[in-house]
Amino acid sequence: TTMTQNTALTTPRVVLLDIEGTTLPVAFVHKVLFPYARTHLPALLAQQSDNPVVVQALAETAQLAPGVPAAEQLERWMDTDAKVAPLKSLQGLCWEQGYRQGELVADLYADVVPTLKAWKAAGLTLAVYSSGSEAAQKLIYGYTEQGDVTPLFSAFFDLKVGGKRESASYR
């Protein structure tokens, strides 16, 4: 068999999208979202200490960094842009407050919404896979300059399915 026969292209059924640099500028995450979470995280930890998401994230932080105070470890992770589930969950909670209070609005690239709508109309399944939590992904697409575009997506995947560089995450 020739190389051409072995690499026949099939029509795609799913478009799996990342967020940063794909549907909105990387700068939005690094210059808006991350600083917002860093500023608001201490108050969130104090005010929502009984929130199950906070309790679980702090327990996971303690498991990943035994003997290090949680707030200190979270700061370290933010300093290094670590892709760890407990930090992402807590950042997501901070952002949820910001979006709901109108302090945060995602500005997607101009071609994103028309393209997503065209793909959806063509019968493609649209999904997101990002290191940001599933909840954070839904907030980004739920509070955009173009309105709520979450109905265009069929699925949202985060680090709970595995790392983006691990092939098993895509199975």
Whereabouts are the PLM-identified features?
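Short, Lys/Arg-enriched N-terminal segments with co-localized hydrophobic residues
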Residues: T1-T2
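Asp-based phosphoryl-transfer active-site loop
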Residues: L9-V29
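Short, solvent-exposed loop/turn segments at secondary-structure junctions
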Residues: T22-T23, H30, W95-E96, S133-A135
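Conserved phosphoryl-transfer catalytic core
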Residues: A27-R76
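Metal-dependent phosphoesterase signature
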Residues: A65-A110
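Short, compositionally biased "basic patch" segments
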Residues: W77-L90, S131-E145
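Substrate-recognition element of Asp-dependent hydrolases with the DxDx(T/V) motif
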Residues: Q101-T144
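Substrate-recognition "cap/lid" segment bordering the active-site pocket of phosphatases
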Residues: S133-R171
